[in-house]
Structure formats: C-alpha cells, structure tokens
C-alpha cells in the first residue's frame, strides 16, 4: 500500500512539471508569500485602489514575470466601467500587453486611453492569490493595494504611476491586498 501511494505521488509529480516550478520559493511572490530568494524585492511606490470593470484576464506561467504576477487584468474605470460601454470594448492580451478597441468612442481618444489599462496583478497573500483568478469578464471589482517595483537579479519591473501614459511601461504593477466583487455582469 505504501509503495502504491508513493508511485501515485511520483506519477502525479511527473505530470505537474510547470505546477512544481510555480511552488518553488522562486515563485513565493506569485503565491502571495514574501520573497525569500536573495535577489528578489518588492518596493511600494504608492497606495492604489478603485473600482475596475474586468474586460479580460490572462494567466501566465512561463514568462519571467510569472514569478511575481500570475495574472493580468484588462480593466476599465470611470465612464468606461459602465456596462453599456464596457460590453462594446473588445480586448486581446498577449505577452503582458493589451490591445483594445471599441467601434464608437463616446469620448475623445486621448480621454478614452485614460480609462482602459492592463494591470499586472501581484497577490499580497495566499488567499488573494486564489481570489484573483476567479474574476470574469464583466465583473466590477474593488481592488485595494499598492503600486510597486519588483527587483530580481537583472530584472527591474516598475509600475506606471500615471493614467495618462501609453505603450511599454504604461501598465500598473499592482500588489493587491483586497478584492471585493461590487457586481457581477455578463458583458
């Protein structure tokens, strides 16, 4: 019986290649734990919170940043968080980037760019690490935490601090301490 359990455990382990990697101490931050690797650190840049409409989410396992941020959220806020507008926004998330479009902008393009963003989500604790993966397109969530900078060996990953920037480096690197569902919508 003992050998059978060991064999089952061994087979389960062999079939979990990437899952095993994500449980190593290198992935502590992505699992909501404190960094223990000697070159890893998180620095708070400023507190951040708000209501955000989820336009999409993408889970990452294999990129360098997955050690810290296991999921990205495509979000809107303000006027663009209203369901009648948000349902018309289509998103494509890839390689930690976000492309979005809407057939008819209800505001000037410059203003619209300030109401949609890609957020790299870092869980502040193991409970949040589970909750952040439960969002669905259309959910309005209240997120509270900090915009941060991550350092790891040769990597410096720093959050944007302004909603007016676009392009590379314009995303929020958001360490989430709490998440509350304000409403669930199907958009």
Name these PLM-found stretches.
Residues 1-7:
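Bacterial N-terminal signal peptides that target proteins for export
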Residues 3, 15-22:
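Sequence termini and other peripheral, non-core segments
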Residues 19-187:
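OB-fold and OB-like single-stranded nucleic-acid-recognition modules
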Residues 9-15:
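Bacterial N-terminal signal peptides
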């Amino acid at each position: 019986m003992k050998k059978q359990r060991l064999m089952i455990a061994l087979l389960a382990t062999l079939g979990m290649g990437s899952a095993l990697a994500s449980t190593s101490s290198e992935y502590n931050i992505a699992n909501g734990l404190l960094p223990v690797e000697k070159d890893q650190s998180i620095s708070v840049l400023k507190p951040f919170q708000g209501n955000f409409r989820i336009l999409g989410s993408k889970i990452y396992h294999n990129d360098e940043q997955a050690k810290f941020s296991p999921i990205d959220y495509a979000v809107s806020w303000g006027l663009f968080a209203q369901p009648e507008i948000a349902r018309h926004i289509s998103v494509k998330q890839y390689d930690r980037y976000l492309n979005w479009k809407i057939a008819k902008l209800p505001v000037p393009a410059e203003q619209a760019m300030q109401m949609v963003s890609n957020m790299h989500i870092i869980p502040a604790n193991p409970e949040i690490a589970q909750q952040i993966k439960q969002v669905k397109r259309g959910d309005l969530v209240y997120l509270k935490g900090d915009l941060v900078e991550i350092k790891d060996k040769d990597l410096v990953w720093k959050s944007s601090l302004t909603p007016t920037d676009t392009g590379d480096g314009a995303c929020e690197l958001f360490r989430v301490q709490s998440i509350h569902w304000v409403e669930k919508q199907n958009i």
